[in-house]
């Protein structure tokens, strides 16, 4: 398994938990051979390259990996390393399972109502990186072309970005979400979009989703329009405007099982949902190509450099991303041990500083001691 180095020690803490879960689950009959590959600050310091070609080559060769939070310099023309990894490996589905762990303080009244799998398209939309800088020769030329060919008037002092949404990318993302819903006995899937405004991009995403339901999933799924909200034993598929969704998922999250959405909407929605369950510190993520099997699982938060070297950062997101990785590999027994250990530590209040906030019954642990508590839980199960 490829392991991308993090700027924080949470990587080592997480690896300790992963190895313990595998040892417990399979009685030394299985083992992970870890291989470190570089990206982010460590790669730049050692190789003068934020994302070396060898890192992508190793992920491509071995097909699965897990990644800690990485630093990308703001500005300066350097693209997000996370986005670059996803696009270079064509990891088209960003999958975010969102659930609450009993004992975690949240701002909502019923965090336990959140049990949602969010599928976010990972390769297109405004994240495709097709942008032109204000006052550049390229943006002036494009402005001139758009005015002459389409009559579009765009202010001359504008930067311009392109928002591609393709049928190919939309269908494979929604197909992955539908397959997940089928395999996990989910009752509904919501296509979240802004097609009321962007009719030929996000509106097309919605339309292609409904077409896919009819053409490939009609035996197991049905649209709201075709059943008037009464799907019988099939998965109910409906669409929700993105801004309305952000309201509805706060008021009635129990009505949503699986979400399929575009890249930018998914970025907003996944972090908003994470806030409902206690924050991104316990929110895992995976970037997956279900067609060729390649995947990179990752912590969903940033590097928090102000806590570097303090043994303070919460490794929960990366550890739970490892649980996702195990389940994707078919190592469900190891995954179950990780989940049970996490549930026990959190419910007993043995947590890192961020999860201790607002709790009177919590014992604040360092990052390493939190990992040790998880290992002890695994060994006692």
Each model region followed by its residue ranges:
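Single conserved hydrophobic/aromatic residue that forms the stacking wall/gate
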Residues: 1-5, 10
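N-terminal beta-loop-helix "entrance" segment that forms/cooperates
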Residues: 26-52
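Flexible, glycine/charged-enriched surface loops at secondary-structure junctions
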Residues: 27-33, 184-193, 218-238, 331-339, ...
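Glycine-rich phosphate/nucleotide-binding loop
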Residues: 41-44, 246-350
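N-terminal glycine-rich phosphate/adenylate-binding segment common to multiple enzyme folds
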Residues: 43-146, 159, 264-268
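Glycine-rich phosphate-binding loop
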Residues: 56-73, 216-292, 378
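Active-site pocket-lining segments that scaffold enzyme catalytic pockets across diverse folds
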Residues: 164-218, 238, 242
